[in-house]
């Protein structure tokens, strides 16, 4: 069934444009509130947000929708996405909502939904919500005496800080570690520096002054250049880069080199396997993870199960097949022993634990494999279905034949933007670049011709 509102990570778009309008947000609140409201009992929803200016607008619209449906609302304020999932369980809420567009620019925003177990909603429930939004909302409204109330929650970030700190083994501290944290002017700007400092680290914080429009602006996990420079400047042991809602993380070693999610997953997988903590016989990653990671795991008799792009699909596979480590190259890392979704801070703490335990620099700990040459490029489209175009199909088939068994080709539409993502990898760097550029050229040409 074609989706009109939900993408791979909730509902997302430009603020004040369809579908990220106050009207739609209110209807989402009404529909979700009706579905999760417990008849005859007090029902509650927790709502968090990142630091985008439009968060205020959408927050108020959601409050109107949920209270109209008869649910009480707990407002958490600016807080990481994984904290919303955790607090949904901790506060025994019936539903959790995060207002965020993750790593996107400030002018975008989104709505992510979590069930009472802290996991993202199923496709079936999302389709049910879409159908309700499109119809008459009147039947979903509560009676006069059952309209909900709203209140702001105090101390919620401290609950999450304590939760995150407890994931670091008690016999390990961060004493003597100089850490630079890039908060992306986003939702982690309070919790990440506080947790690291309380665990003993010397913390130097950058991009921790959100003003509503500077979230992810030339900073955070999608723009780590500033962090690389700062680590070198202050001679830090490690840099930690979060994204706007702090559900993903990249590290920078003491030499100023970026360490992506694939390397981080390799560290955790090897460490947890050695201590018999790794479940499922391996880890779960997406089709975008590097072939080098797959080879590294295979050499240690560990498997790499691949899914579609999107941490929700990683989590679904983990739950269905008994894995406790999964993630994406982009830095979404899910450790189900601790969390139900990607958590940048907790993932970083697990890497720091390995480094402290082994008494080795981050550069030694996190260089587990030599990545296979990989190139990812995006091409913006003007609508339609370019991947069904005959010339595009022919170019893709030709590329697969040229790569043969020595590489991989992944082509997919973005779930959040009007883009086609083209990724190829293989041992021959020149061939990889040629394959990607040829496909990009054809898609761009055909898309322009169809416009």
From Swiss-Prot:
Catalytic reactions of this protein: alpha-D-glucosamine 1-phosphate = D-glucosamine 6-phosphate
Active-site residue numbers: 102
Modified residues (Phosphoserine): 102
PTM: Activated by phosphorylation.
Keywords, comma-separated and alphabetical: Isomerase, Magnesium, Metal-binding, Phosphoprotein
Record's cofactor remark: Binds 1 Mg(2+) ion per subunit.
Biological process annotations from GO: carbohydrate metabolic process; peptidoglycan biosynthetic process; UDP-N-acetylglucosamine biosynthetic process
Lipid biosynthesis in keyword set: no
Cellular component terms per the entry's GO annotation: cytosol
EC number(s) on file: 5.4.2.10
Source taxon at top rank: Bacteria
Cofactor annotation: Mg(2+)
UniProt-listed InterPro entries: A-D-PHexomutase_a/b/a-I (IPR005844), A-D-PHexomutase_a/b/a-I/II/III (IPR016055), A-D-PHexomutase_a/b/a-II (IPR005845), A-D-PHexomutase_a/b/a-III (IPR005846), A-D-PHexomutase_C (IPR005843), A-D-PHexomutase_C_sf (IPR036900), A-D-PHexomutase_CS (IPR016066), Alpha-D-phosphohexomutase_SF (IPR005841)
One GO molecular-function entry: phosphoglucosamine mutase activity
Amino acids binding Mg(2+): 102, 243, 245, 247
Function of the protein: Catalyzes the conversion of glucosamine-6-phosphate to glucosamine-1-phosphate.
Family to which the UniProt record says this protein belongs: Belongs to the phosphohexose mutase family.
This protein's name: Phosphoglucosamine mutase
Lineage of origin: Bacteria, Pseudomonadati, Pseudomonadota, Alphaproteobacteria, Hyphomicrobiales
């Amino acid at each position: 069934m074609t989706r009109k509102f939900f993408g791979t990570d909730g509902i997302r778009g430009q603020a004040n444009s369809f579908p990220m309008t106050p009207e739609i947000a209110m209807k989402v609140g009404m529909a979700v509130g009706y579905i999760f409201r417990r008849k005859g009992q007090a029902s509650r929803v927790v709502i968090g947000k990142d630091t985008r200016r439009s968060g205020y607008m959408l927050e108020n619209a959601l409050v109107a929708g949920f209270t109209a449906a008869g649910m009480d609302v707990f407002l958490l304020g600016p807080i990481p996405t994984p904290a919303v999932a955790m607090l949904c369980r901790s506060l025994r809420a019936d539903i959790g909502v995060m207002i965020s567009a993750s790593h996107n620019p400030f002018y975008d925003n989104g709505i992510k939904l979590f069930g009472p177990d802290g996991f993202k909603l199923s496709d079936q429930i999302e389709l049910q919500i879409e159908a309700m939004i499109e119809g008459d909302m009147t039947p979903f409204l509560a009676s006069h005496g059952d309209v909900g109330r709203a209140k702001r929650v105090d101390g919620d970030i401290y609950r999450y800080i304590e939760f995150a700190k407890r994931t670091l083994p008690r016999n390990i501290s961060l004493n003597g570690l100089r850490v630079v944290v890039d908060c992306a002017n986003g939702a982690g700007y309070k919790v990440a520096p506080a947790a690291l400092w309380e665990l003993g680290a010397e913390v130097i914080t950058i991009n921790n002054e959100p003003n509503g429009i500077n979230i992810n602006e030339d900073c955070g996990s999608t723009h780590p250049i500033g962090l690389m420079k700062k680590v070198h400047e202050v001679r830090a042991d490690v840099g930690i880069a979060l994204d706007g809602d702090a559900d993903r993380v990249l590290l920078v070693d003491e030499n100023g080199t970026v360490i992506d999610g694939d390397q981080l997953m390799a560290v955790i997988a090897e460490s947890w396997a050695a201590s018999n903590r790794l479940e499922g016989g391996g880890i779960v990653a997406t089709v975008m993870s590097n072939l080098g990671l797959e080879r590294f795991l295979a050499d240690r008799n560990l498997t790499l199960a691949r899914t579609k792009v999107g941490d929700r699909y990683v989590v679904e596979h983990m739950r269905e097949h008994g894995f406790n480590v999964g993630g994406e190259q982009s830095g979404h890392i899910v450790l189900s022993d601790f969390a139900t979704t990607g958590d940048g801070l907790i993932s970083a703490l697990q890497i720091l634990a390995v480094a402290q335990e082994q008494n080795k620099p981050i550069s030694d700990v996190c260089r587990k494999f030599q990545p296979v040459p990989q190139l990812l490029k995006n091409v913006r489209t003007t609508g339609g279905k370019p991947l069904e175009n005959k010339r595009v199909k022919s170019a893709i088939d030709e590329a697969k034949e040229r790569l043969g068994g020595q590489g991989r080709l992944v082509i997919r539409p973005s779930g959040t933007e009007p883009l086609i993502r083209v990724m190829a990898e293989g041992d021959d760097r020149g061939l990889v670049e040629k394959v990607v550029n040829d496909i990009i050229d054809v898609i761009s040409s055909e898309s322009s011709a169809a416009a």
